[in-house]
Amino acid sequence: MSYLLAIGIAALIVALIIAIVVWTIVYIEYKKLVRQRKINKLYKRIRERAEDSGNESEGDAEELAALGEMGPFIPGDINNL
């Protein structure tokens, strides 16, 4: 009987050690995944900012073109409204 009890306790200890190792590996992989998500988010943000900064000049050009369609600006002519 004590022989079976010793085997049972040893099996529980081995199972506990295996569970600790498995959950440690899962935790390490989870931290890697979270870190990669943060990197991807920063990369996406930087890429969007780069696209935005390139498009600002195009937006300004469109605004200037829209203002240019109003007619010529004559500083001395007050009734140009």
Curated annotation (Swiss-Prot):
PTM comment, free text: Phosphorylated by host CK2. This phosphorylation is necessary for interaction with human BTRC and degradation of CD4.
One GO process term, biological-process aspect: receptor catabolic process
Location in the cell: Host membrane
Transmembrane feature ranges: 8-28
Residues recorded as bearing Phosphoserine in the entry: 53, 57
SUPFAM superfamilies on file: HIV-1 VPU cytoplasmic domain (SSF57647)
Main location: host cell
Topology in membrane: Single-pass type I membrane protein
GO cellular component assignments: host cell membrane; membrane
Top-level lineage group: Viruses
One Pfam family it belongs to: Vpu
Residues exposed to the Extracellular side: 1-7
Keywords, ordered alphabetically: AIDS, Apoptosis, Host membrane, Host-virus interaction, Inhibition of host innate immune response by virus, Inhibition of host tetherin by virus, Ion channel, Ion transport, Membrane, Phosphoprotein, Transmembrane, Transmembrane helix, Transport, Viral immunoevasion
Regulation: Ion channel activity is inhibited by hexamethylene amiloride in vitro.
Cytoplasmic-facing ranges: 29-81
Presence of keyword Transmembrane: yes
One annotated GO molecular function: CD4 receptor binding
HAMAP family registered for this protein in UniProt: HIV_VPU (MF_04082)
Note: HIV-1 lineages are divided in three main groups, M (for Major), O (for Outlier), and N (for New, or Non-M, Non-O). The vast majority of strains found worldwide belong to the group M. Group O seems to be endemic to and largely confined to Cameroon and neighboring countries in West Central Africa, where these viruses represent a small minority of HIV-1 strains. The group N is represented by a limited number of isolates from Cameroonian persons. The group M is further subdivided in 9 clades or subtypes (A to D, F to H, J and K).
Function of the molecule: Enhances virion budding by targeting host CD4 and Tetherin/BST2 to proteasome degradation. Degradation of CD4 prevents any unwanted premature interactions between viral Env and its host receptor CD4 in the endoplasmic reticulum. Degradation of antiretroviral protein Tetherin/BST2 is important for virion budding, as BST2 tethers new viral particles to the host cell membrane. Mechanistically, Vpu bridges either CD4 or BST2 to BTRC, a substrate recognition subunit of the Skp1/Cullin/F-box protein E3 ubiquitin ligase, induces their ubiquitination and subsequent proteasomal degradation.
Notes on the domains: The N-terminus and transmembrane domains are required for self-oligomerization and proper virion budding, whereas the cytoplasmic domain is required for CD4 degradation. The cytoplasmic domain is composed of 2 amphipathic alpha helix that form a U-shape. The N-terminal and transmembrane domains are required for proper virion budding, whereas the cytoplasmic domain is required for CD4 degradation. The cytoplasmic domain is composed of 2 amphipathic alpha helix.
Quaternary data: Homopentamer. Interacts with host CD4 and BRTC; these interactions induce proteasomal degradation of CD4. Interacts with host BST2; this interaction leads to the degradation of host BST2. Interacts with host FBXW11. Interacts with host AP1M1; this interaction plays a role in the mistrafficking and subsequent degradation of host BST2. Interacts with host RANBP2; this interaction allows Vpu to down-regulate host BLM sumoylation.
Family: Belongs to the HIV-1 VPU protein family.
UniProt-recorded name of the protein: Protein Vpu
